[in-house]
Amino acid sequence: MRHKLNLDLRSVDRIAMLIHSAYGAGKTYLVGDMLKAELERTKGPVLFVNVKGEDGTLSLADMGLGDVGETVETLTDWKELVADAHKRGLKAIGVDSMKALVRLVMRDKIGVDRPPEKTEYGIIHWVMENLATELRTLASVVLCVCPSDKSVNQLDGRTYITPDLPGREAAGSAGWFDFVGYLKADTLSPKEVTRAITFAPNASIITRQRLPKPITHDISIPTGKGGWAAIRGAIEKALQS
């Protein structure tokens, strides 16, 4: 369908974002914080998707989100969830995690008794790209998370910290989203952890941002609620600068 575009428009009405980090940095909590903030801002329906194998929803128990989550265990479950989500007019959707989702794709396409052969990665990448890009059609705000790993970029041969996805998806998944950020967590004491997200271009970490003027500073993520507000605020400020 053809439609006109205003290329001068500066808006964050639609966001598709991937955040990756080491385990235990607070990714799942950030997804819950986003859903709570968007629920309060828009008063519309939101959805948390727990992909079997992650199961970190206990970290969200104090947020008061209620019955807005769903677990998918197979690729068929995922497709049914997407079909239902198209009818619901979701304002925001969070997916935990992309690594678990690619396992569902691999199980569906090649089985579970062996790793993929080299010739099979093509279909896995194609399916994952389609699943990820379709998420944009489900809600105004999409936040996916994924653990990080070190990977060799197949284009330039350099080693990066990337989302922990197979083959060329590790670096290529950045093309599926408007924003790709890396969440850092530094433990100062058993009771004190400082967190920050970077979207700035980095020679050793996969990041991305579709902004006319890039965010070049780390975004501090407060303990508890307020992380999504900090991210959204930084994006809005960059758009208006």
Predicted regions and their residues:
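C-terminal regions of RecA-like/P-loop NTPase motor modules
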Residues: 1-2, 11-12, 190-241
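Conserved P-loop
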Residues: 2-88, 92-95, 99-104
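A generic structural signal for well-ordered alpha-helical segments
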Residues: 35, 85, 135, 173-174
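Single-residue recognition of alpha-helix boundary sites
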Residues: 38, 107-108, 189
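P-loop NTPase motor core
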Residues: 92-172
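Phosphate-binding/switch region of NTP-binding enzymes
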Residues: 142-218
